[in-house]
Amino acid sequence: MDFLTDWLTNWLKELLIGGIMGNLEGLFDTVNTQVGEIAAQVGTTPAAWHAGVFSLIRQLSETVILPIAGMVLTFVATYELIQMLLEKNNMHEVDIANLYKWMFKTACAILILSNTFNIVMAVFDVSQSVIAQAGGLIQGSTDVSADMLAELETSLEAMDLGPLLGLWLQSALIGFTMKAMGIIIFVLVYGRMLEIYLLTSLAPIPVATLSNRELGSTGQNYIKSLFAVGFQGLLILVCVAIYAVLIQGIATSGDPIGAIWGTVGYTVLLCFMLFKTGSIAQRIFGAH
């Protein structure tokens, strides 16, 4: 009878240990996979992310928004000319050099406005290049080796049946948590790209105000917002990379229960910080 009880207990322990290790191996595999996917997604330029959407946004910007921006620039240039003429004793003293300066300034503003889309894409090309380089470095440092999981399995074998059952239930719960985190990451990464497209579609209007001293703050803040959204991808990548490195420490801690709940805590922390990346990027670049 004792032999049968021992056999059944050992069989259940092996079953639970196998289930726990399966959950944890899948959990750590998910971490590595998500790091790679995020590196690929946030490192993709708007043109390469979705060709159809990119073409639509470009047509909208160049055919609908650009003419409106041209009217804004006309108003800005005319307003500056009137101000310049009235500065010198109500047009009694007109400095010809100032007229040449105004013509040169207006010509530069027209040139910039006509190339707005290319300038905006150049901003994102710079940020995506930095993200791609960082993604290559980060991907190489987040692999969870088989030795780490082997140490964890050894500690599981020394546990009794009751704690193993509870640990298996907890590991299953963590699996659902990781899926929820994947959805949150999906929303953030894809939402960021949609934000980039929306910013790009209306780009000519704020750019048209850059040449004016009083209204130029609108265009300057827009440029800052472009850099903030572009480099937000780097902050997202850094957050997930830090998370993956912390998970490595959990895998080698030798405490299965601590590993499970440590993963829960780090997952919640990651989701919180991912939501904060946008505001952090805006503070860094002074956008508001």
Short names for language-model regions:
Residues 16, 106-202, 236, 240-285:
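Non-cytosolic segments of integral membrane proteins
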Residues 1, 8, 12-23, 94-112, ...:
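Alpha-helical transmembrane segments and their helix-start/interface "positive-inside/aromatic belt" motifs
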Residues 70, 74-86, 236-251:
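Juxtamembrane "helix exit" motif at the C-terminal ends of alpha-helical transmembrane segments
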Residues 72-108, 202-216:
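Hydrophobic transmembrane alpha-helix segments characteristic of membrane transport
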Residues 207-224, 251-253, 282-287:
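Alpha-helical transmembrane segments
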Residues 33-65, 85, 89, 109, ...:
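Internal transmembrane helix-loop-helix hairpins in multi-pass membrane proteins, together
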Residues 48-63, 90-98, 163, 167, ...:
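Membrane-helix interfacial "entry" motifs
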Residues 1-72:
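Binding/recognition "hotspot" determinant
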